[in-house]
Amino acid sequence: MSQKQQTMKTIIAEKPSVAKEIAHIVGADKREEGYMQGNGYYVTWVFGHLVQPAMPETYGMKGFHAENLPVIPDPFVLVPRQVKTENGYKPDAGVLAQIKIIGKLFDSSERIIVATDAGREGELIFRYLYTYLGCRKPFDRLWISSLTDTAIREGLQNLRDGKEYDNLYHAAKARSEADWLVGINGTQALTIAAGRGTYSVGRVQTPTLGMVCERYWEHKRFESKPFWQVHFGVVDADSGNILKFTSANRWTDKATATDIYNKVKETGSAIITKVATKRKVEKAPLLYDLTTLQKEANSQHGFTAEHTLSIAQKLYEAKFITYPRTSSRYISDDVFATLPKLFKNLENHSEYGEKVKLLPGSEDYSKNSVNAAKVTDHHALLITENAAIGLFKDEKIVYDMILCRMIEAFSADCIKDITSVSAQVDHEVEFGISGSIIRQTGWRALSLKEKNKRQDKDADATDNEVKEQVIPNWQEGQHITLSGCTITEGKTKPKPLHTESTLLAAMETAGKEIEDDTMRQAMKDSGIGTPATRAAIIETLLKREYMVRQQKKLVPTEKGLALHSVVKNMAIANVEMTGKWEAELAKIERGEASADGFTHSIEGYTREITAELLGCDRLFSHKDSGCQCPKCKQGTMQFFGKVVRCSNKECGMPVFKQVAGKLLTDSDITDLLTKGKTRTLNGFTSKQGKSFSAAIAFDENFNTKFVFAEHKTAEKRGNVKRYKK
């Protein structure tokens, strides 16, 4: 740091790659260890949270002991990021080195420019480090929504006083401490009550797991019932097409439906009883926020929420799109004013030019997504002026989604005329048909939703669209001649298992089913999690083996179902309460609520859930199997509901009784534990729904596997729960 004679400023970015871009703009072109310098600037970086709240060991509380709970630090101690070792948590050496470098840079600077991500978590990353270092230097905030050279230069020319973001910091700090209190105390309390294994719970993850489990049980317990409907056709005299009428009723008795069918067939005609035409205006869809992008990328392309976020982050850092972790689907008027130039730059593009030309003139752009009052920290997702080149397949898919949504969002409304016709047969049985005619295509000319509909339509997708067909100019009282009659059988269907798309939607509205985009936006402060954290919550539940992915579906494991069965009626699993906490954090961020009041409430909540969880040991009742653990040879295997587990806490090897849809008997488990293999058992069900027979055995790592009669073995992943060392 040889520039002591010159007045220096330190710019701190969230990643080395971002620091490199900023250093280029400010002329800090000399590379040093952990930073760059030049032209009066030091430009350094963090890599995630370098500083975090300390673990309970720091407060002298080692191990899991009921008498220590709840652990409520006052104040919270901040420590360098730690890694777990055999001897407990230790500071990360690389983190310590970078903290030391940053501390010296701060000391050598007159002022600090904060260039961490412009959001709640980015603010906390800097503030925790600033507090830990005991720094008192004044700081300004670089608050930008893209990393283009233009955006960085404009941001540096319009730095904001760091104190303007105190409320953002207070909200971030309150969220961090709340997650610590609930996660640490809840996990320790439930693990103590269980008496074996580790059961992780969290302020957001446990209610989220609850929504997955509740949907699973609702789906599994649903009793599908048959129903019958009658249909008849009528030939359109103008087109020659056969138009299909369907009975308004669904009959659960086949005999009744058959009688109706015979009557319709015998009568051969119907009378029009009602004709109604109404105009439907479908406004252009709102721009993407992160959650909506993740939902549609999952339903259309099968991308996980984490994968979509990762791609969006790469596109942002490559300067191709604006800040991805946004919760807003709107832009302000000043951003709206830049769009004509942005779209004009694409007119001659080989691929996007034709799409952009579908837009109306700029004076006729839809302003459905323009509302400055609904712009939060960042506006909705947009592409930047930089040409997106060199994209990999998945990156191009996400980029195209964002661009095409922009074109849709600023296109004209789609206008349809929808005609509904009712008819009666023998003045008794009601039938109906509907058809729509598009009068103005508008934004649907480029509707990805229309173009990407797959033949194997997702089970979680809904299609409320009225079929596009011309209805003849029938009049009430007119008699029509029938052309054929059919009877069809259908079955009632349960709500489908959650996909990441539907789970994200449920998290967004705290479990409330809301289809309207505008209403969903109004609910966003009361959802659980944030756009920036929801993907991580889903991945946490998968990593902790509370649920698994089966194709696109999210299916709870026996471990997840067992946890939910214990906590489902407790405060820790209350989705609505978690949504209220998120709404309170949003108020803190806006300066409408006190962080101290929130913290006081969370501490009371922590005491409540800790007492509840410690008191649920009776729900973990167990019995001894009388069998030695085949793995460690020290503990005994004990029955806990649908799980058999080693009593040795150092081992804890589990054997799940539910295997591929079949519940093993105690006798089967005893054979497996003592002989290493069961007899050949019937009644297993494959992922394809086919029944098969096999024995269950241990492999060399004491994972369970199938052994088939022909002595070939095959590991059925997703059906047999595997124990990981």
What does each of the following model-derived ranges do?
Residues 94, 107, 149-232, 277-278:
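C-terminal or mid-to-C-terminal helical accessory/interaction module adjacent to the motor/catalytic core
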Residues 7-8, 116-118, 195-198, 277-286, ...:
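Conserved short loop/turn motifs at secondary-structure junctions
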Residues 2-176, 180, 186, 451-454, ...:
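Intrinsically disordered, low-complexity regulatory segments
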Residues 16-23, 40-43, 47, 66-69, ...:
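Amphipathic alpha-helical transducer elements in NTP-driven molecular machines
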